[in-house]
Amino acid sequence: MKFTKMQGAGNDYVYVDCTKLPLANPSEVAVRVSDRHFGIGSDGLILIKPSDNADFFMEMYNADGSQGQMCGNGIRCVGKYVYDNGLTDKTTVNVETLAGIKILKLNVGDDGKVASVVVNMGKPELEASKVPVDVNALVEYKAAYRNTYKNDAKLCPLAVKALDNVENAVINEAILVDGKSYDITGVSMGNPHDIVYLDNDMDITKFDIEKVGPYFENHKAFPERINTEFVQVLDRKTLNMRVWERGSGETFACGTGTCATVVATVLN
């Protein structure tokens, strides 16, 4: 198997060109190559495949072999891979994923290689049942946001627009995890995220994400498991974030998670 290892913001995957030949047992391969001691070492496996609906299809697997719907950093690397390896000469590339078709804008440097990629990540999904979050598994679903935005529509026009036609959103709702109460906000960017805000007076590098992360990931409130972002708001333009990805554990970065975190921070 020929492969290329690439990273976006430290979010690293093993990439395989499957445009001509398929890869057998990709879930099993993902587990083997992702092992950082006995394999190549990565957050997962990404296959670049043909598509009937777009230029390419991105098929991704987490480190535990489970299939994911979307990866923001991963799809940026797909854009660089297909251009730099001559699979396309387009600088606007459409890539199909399980979360829909994403449009990539490639910035080509003077050396003829892709220097950066901008991705249209699409509209965030806030409807609880579509994130999905089971509101019945929360401490007590209050939906207090409804009165907040109804009583003061000028509070945040972006939030008001995002919540249009949303019946039940999970915004700053309490959840009991390993005996402790946390407030979460649920957002889907094609894959499920819950955002948790931490106190600024704590050292986020010492937060025990290895212990807490799996409890969130496998909580009964999240029927498809969950990616969890633990966030500190340093100021109105700066966030500090650590992420626990379902199926992969803590990763250096998460593109969809960063988008979900910004959405959640606006909502809050």
Q: Where does each model-flagged region fall?
A:
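ATP-dependent small-molecule kinase catalytic core of the GHMP/sugar-kinase superfamily
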Residues: 98-197
